[in-house]
Amino acid sequence: MRTEYCGQLRLSHVGQQVTLCGWVNRRRDLGSLLFIDMRDREGIVQVFFDPDRADALKLASELRNEFCIQVTGTVRARDEKNINRDMATGEIEVLASSLTIINRADVLPLDSNHVNTEEARLKYRYLDLRRPEMAQRLKTRAKITSLVRRFMDDHGFLDIETPMLTKATPEGARDYLVPSRVHKGKFYALPQSPQLFKQLLMMSGFDRYYQIVKCFRDEDLRADRQPEFTQIDVETSFMTAPQVREVMEALVRHLWLEVKGVDLGDFPVMTFAEAERRYGSDKPDLRNPMELTDVADLLKSVEFAVFAGPANDPKGRVAALRVPGGASLTRKQIDEYGNFVKIYGAKGLAYIKVNERAKGLEGINSPVAKFLNAEIIEAILERTGAQDGDMIFFGADNKKIVADAMGALRLKVGKDLGLTDESKWAPLWVIDFPMFEDDGEGGLTAMHHPFTSPKDMTAAELKAAPENAVANAYDMVINGYEVGGGSVRIHNGDMQQTVFGILGINEEEQREKFGFLLDALKYGTPPHAGLAFGLDRLTMLLTGTDNIRDVIAFPKTTAAACLMTEAPSFANPTALAELSIQVVKKAENN
């Protein structure tokens, strides 16, 4: 039906007869002449109808936005004065000789000339995807997956599929369950990741595996998460953590070079402890130049419990954040930041405005200055590198609250004051995470997952002091987003059972949930390590959007619903009966 795409026509096509298929993007009727912007997935081209082709011109007068049409015509060069430098096809136009209206369009529920609500965009997603910016994002996503496959093939990785219907295993979120009709009362789980299957593939001898795979997590959704998402999943045997990072870094550098024309350079490596100390986050945005500075040792003897308490508590921390030029902040803005940190558990936000440092106490403005002598204030200014016109904010509490609150404040202030360089790319690796963290109930939970190997510890040493264990894990972070994470896996049965025990999984439960894995570990398991990238998040970064739904063709809302198909929906009672399932309604509270 077509000979060319609209958006691919150039001066080299001048004089050629072409047939185009697509949609009316815009129509301009000048009486004796009628122009349309005709659109397909590759872009837009101007088509015009003149009186010499009266039949085509008459039919064109019926055209409206989003009519699906076919046009045959001749490509012509535009006059110099009519060239549109903002269009890829702006140097040419098509003189139509014939027009076919393939399908007409009703009045559109979306307005291309205004910003539509996200609810409307998701309900009429098939129309939203016609927009050039949306089409371009999905084309970029397709390019990314193609680049990934070629890179992985070139590096000896095998694309191997793993099951979608599997067994529920604890991986940190709730599973989506699928009832079995054949096995009454039993359920499959949709995979949160192919984690155990890819480890089993290593045990099977497939030493380089990858897969671009759908994963499912039934969890409360944030703006950058979806209940079903896509991973670039990777596993290797006989490779160390640095070797895995080297190959995966090369993959991401390749993507940025091919898609953005940007060389990311070598990625710096930072430990979890350093990232938390300097940035208050295990996924720091290095485009923001501000850092946290520990000042607890300067404040242990002050008669101000807000500072002295955490300063003298081994589990406490007092950190300062110097904001260049922050002295210009108003009291209202400071109060807003004070309320902001309370979201993260902080009780408030102390500060020092540095007006003229050389004047000592007279050169600052601070509600806590009365608790601090000139010597302590000067020591704080010296350590933070404060200059005239700067602001210093303080966080004082337990280590987690200080990191969370001050890390979030750092990001917000950096964005608000334009201190974060939005034009930069800032990748890094974060390594050496704690293996376990407090579960809030007196026990421990795995920071990554229970199949991650500890670093430089025997099973006996791990059992004796699990709180000291460092995971042989690594995350890739770009511009403050965790785009991928992985680890060296446990390849020894005793170590795996020790980890399960630390997590409160008794031997009976171990056999019930992971018996197949424990059995497999008995038969010459190779050392193995891997990583998974979030394809959706990578695409989000590479297309310059901050909404993950913009890079998924048919996404869900934050309530895990599809507004277009109205999924989820109630099941047919007969189908439920076949599955031996009965829906029980909760009693309403009177």
Swiss-Prot record:
It comes from the Bacteria. This is Aspartate--tRNA ligase. One of its GO terms (molecular function) is nucleic acid binding. GO terms for biological process: aspartyl-tRNA aminoacylation. Its EC number is 6.1.1.12. ATP binds at residues 217-219, 226, 482, 534-537. InterPro entries: Aa-tRNA-synt_II, aa-tRNA-synth_II, aa-tRNA-synth_II/BPL/LPL, Asp-tRNA-ligase_1, Asp-tRNA-ligase_1_N, Asp/Asn-tRNA-synth_IIb, AspRS_core, GAD-like_sf. It is found in: Cytoplasm. Residues 195-198 are annotated as: Aspartate. L-aspartate binds at residues 171, 217, 448, 489. Homodimer. Belongs to the class-II aminoacyl-tRNA synthetase family. Type 1 subfamily. Its main location: cytoplasm. Keywords: Aminoacyl-tRNA synthetase, ATP-binding, Cytoplasm, Ligase, Nucleotide-binding, Protein biosynthesis. One of its GO terms (cellular component) is cytoplasm.
